[in-house]
Amino acid sequence: MGTKNGFGNAQILALAGGIVSIISVFLPWYSAKASMFGVASSISVNGLGSISGNGLLLGLWRENATWEFQGLGVLALGIVSIAVAALLREKIRSMAMFICGILIIGGWAVNIRSIWEFSGEFMDASMQSGAGYGLYIVALAGAMVAAGGLLAWRDVTE
């Protein structure tokens, strides 16, 4: 089914998923908060490994942590999804969009497994850490691209 701009609904869904995938790389994939004796500290890390935050926690983790997220892969797949949705022919496009979506979801699965979640309190100190919202948006973007591929395949077979 086409629209005024020449793109079908499946292509628009995959294009939107690719754009959301690119944006998600710059959102927090990991976040942590700690407080002790009324002093709070926080840290967040995006898909490209850029660390931001404040307080003691930032200083401790900036030196010792290695961030091996697959953000570049998700970024590249988002760009490829946009190119595939805009440039390829129908049958190849539908399969390529679906594969890109599955690979983006795979990037989410690899990263969600590598992030440990913790929440605890001891005396007057507390700490919470886990996956940031950007990582869940990666899964949404992958689902959008894969759904666009499935819709495109359905349109081709009709």
Regions found by a protein language model. Name each.
Residues 1-158:
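Compact integral membrane and secretory-pathway proteins
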